[in-house]
């Protein structure tokens, strides 16, 4: 009787094979993550590795840092970057499909969906243009694109210009900072005056003047030399203002004459 009971219990037990145990172990160690499956042995640039080395040196309790810790930190950081990269692509792919789906609806449907889903339009728009640029690149440049600062890629993808020039910027990337790369992109792909993202020089000047005025109000004491420098700046500003007013009057007179002729 006892043998029959044992046989029945064993029959209804779920077999646990070595393969299942191996899969479970890999899952716990993160090797079967859906994101990690697409990893192409991610690596950081030499500049990025130097920054992480500097971080460990700054916060280490000893004079020497652990090579193992540095390797692990760089490896994990590279994986984090690639996880974010793949997430952006997944977002971009779905956003593009939604845009195609809503083309048969009234204008504004896609923007309304972006606001409902993301709370803003800029973030999903960045994901979309990133995905579209990535999709058009040859495989060799897709790997290079991952090395570029994310914000710079968003700007590059959104600018009007030839695919060849965009690929050249990606191909020639030598570890420049985000600011340096943005300067290259803006020089190569300047915004048109009619572009809504284009900020007129006058608006930039007014913004700087407003910031300067706000800072001066916070000053409780200034030196004699600083007061003299401030007076010179005020005189220059008055001269610039006079010239602008004069030019504005000339433009108005020209427009009035032109209108009277018409």
Swiss-Prot record:
Pfam families: UPF0137. Belongs to the UPF0137 (pGP6-D) family. This is Virulence plasmid protein pGP6-D-related protein. It comes from Chlamydia muridarum (strain MoPn / Nigg).
């Amino acid at each position: 009787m006892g043998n029959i009971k044992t046989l029945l219990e064993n029959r209804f037990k779920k077999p646990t094979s070595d393969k299942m145990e191996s899969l479970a172990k890999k899952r716990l160690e993160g090797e079967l993550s859906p994101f990690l499956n697409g990893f192409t042995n991610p690596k950081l640039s030499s500049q990025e590795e130097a920054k992480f080395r500097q971080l460990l040196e700054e916060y280490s309790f000893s004079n020497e840092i652990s090579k193992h810790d540095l390797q692990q930190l760089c490896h994990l950081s590279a994986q984090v970057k690639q996880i974010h990269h793949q997430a952006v692509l997944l977002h971009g792919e779905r956003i593009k499909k939604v845009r195609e789906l809503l083309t048969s609806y009234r204008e504004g449907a896609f923007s309304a969906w972006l606001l409902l889903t993301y709370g803003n339009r800029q973030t999903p728009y960045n994901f979309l243009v990133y995905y579209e640029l990535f999709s058009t690149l040859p495989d060799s440049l897709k790997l290079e694109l991952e090395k570029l600062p994310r914000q710079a890629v968003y700007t590059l993808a959104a600018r009007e210009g030839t695919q060849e020039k965009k690929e050249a910027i990606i191909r020639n990337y030598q570890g420049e900072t985000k600011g340096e790369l943005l300067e290259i992109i803006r020089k190569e792909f300047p915004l048109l005056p009619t572009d809504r993202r284009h900020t007129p020089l006058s608006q930039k000047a007014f913004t700087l003047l407003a910031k300067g005025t706000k800072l001066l109000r916070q000053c409780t004491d200034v030196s004699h030399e600083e007061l003299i420098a401030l007076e010179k700046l005020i005189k220059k500003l008055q001269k610039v203002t006079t010239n602008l007013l004069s030019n504005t009057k000339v433009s108005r007179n020209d427009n009035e004459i032109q209108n009277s002729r018409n």
